[in-house]
Amino acid sequence: MRNLFLMAALLMAAWVTAQVPFVGEWITIDDESGEQKSVVNIYKADNGMYYGQIVTLFEEPDALCTECKDADYNQPIVGLTIVRDMQLVDGELRGGKVLDPENGKLYYAKIYLENGKLILRGSLDKRGLIGRSQTWIRK
């Protein structure tokens, strides 16, 4: 009976993960240097939207967001929510924004999976024509 319960719990966990493939911790890779920069935890909030919070910063773990605006100004980068207000639409996260802590700017965001990797596209325009992409790998 105990084995049956354990198997059911494992199947349920696998099913939940399969339903929400974006949720979890991702290692961010700098698109210019190719180096690992941080770990971001993507989660689904009670409001049904998806967010991403920096949980680890590999260089300067005590760094502050000195370029950020408003409530994010001078806040620790670890703990900062950089992926905001994303909605799951047709297998992609869309409609929200991404914060670049290096320059403090918010960009339109789109997130999708490709070959098991997360692709985050940050852009100046809603259509994603003017911007750049980063590839993140699951932790």
Where are these regions (language model features)?
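Acidic, glycine-rich flexible loop segments
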Residues: 98-115, 121
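Edge beta-strand at a domain terminus
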Residues: 115-117, 124-139
